[in-house]
């Protein structure tokens, strides 16, 4: 039988080489009255993408890829009803989101968690466009000494959102085991090879603020322009020796047996359009965040505290 073709909005840009027609597997979820597609990894080795994908999108051979927010046709590999079980998260990357995905799939009424890592500011754009059910965010505003709310007020004045804490994270400098270069703080970044996070990432915003505090400019840091999209990717750069250090969370350093120099505690929140609070998929997330067993899983990663996990946050209420 012919497969169903539906219009979908892409959550991020998909680059492609002109001259070759490509098929990209996507995870598709229904957000309000539109279908939103998250591009998954490519290549024959990506067995997991087959199980995670709900369809695929064709990139014509004359195109140099497809842009973020573009609406394109997707061929479904599942029934359209299946798309109502996908929870779309767009924003900052955190390892806890993988735990959340795992737990949601194990529920009697499973939901699939489709997460796109575009940084906290990318999450704000997705919320503004109505392209996600929730967004992970950890944007620190030095002016108000508050997280996330100053940015929500500035960029999402017309979107009614509810902010729920996921965890408090330990951010710092990821260094090789034994810290051979004796990196103790931001001042040391002038003498080492650094690996940065992408523009718009909360970690990058924190770094820029710390550099300013130390009286340093981005140009003083060798590798400031080298970017990765996740904490784990930064940690891999340090592990392989491609960089001497990078900013990231303790859990990423611990996962790869690296050392960690703590710099800051930060509040990592889930920002949810209030209209989705009654959605069964979102309610399943909230129930997990309230469960002691899930909080224990978060803390077992290392570098996470859960005193606020599952609680609704209010402006100016840092509570850390």
Give the ranges of each region predicted by the language model:
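Flexible glycine/proline-rich
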Residues: 1-84
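Short helix-loop capping/hinge motifs at secondary-structure junctions, enriched
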Residues: 177-185, 216, 275-280
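Periplasmic-binding protein-like
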Residues: 158-161, 165-170, 258-287, 308-313
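Short helix-initiation/N-cap motifs at beta->coil->alpha
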Residues: 115-125, 219-236
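Ligand-binding cleft/hinge of the Venus flytrap
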Residues: 99-109, 186, 203-226
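N-terminal segment of the mature folded domain
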Residues: 105-184
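A ligand-binding cleft/hinge motif common to bilobed small-molecule-binding domains
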Residues: 136-154, 235-264
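Short loop->beta-strand "edge-of-pocket" segments that line small-molecule binding or catalytic clefts
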Residues: 84-93, 186-206
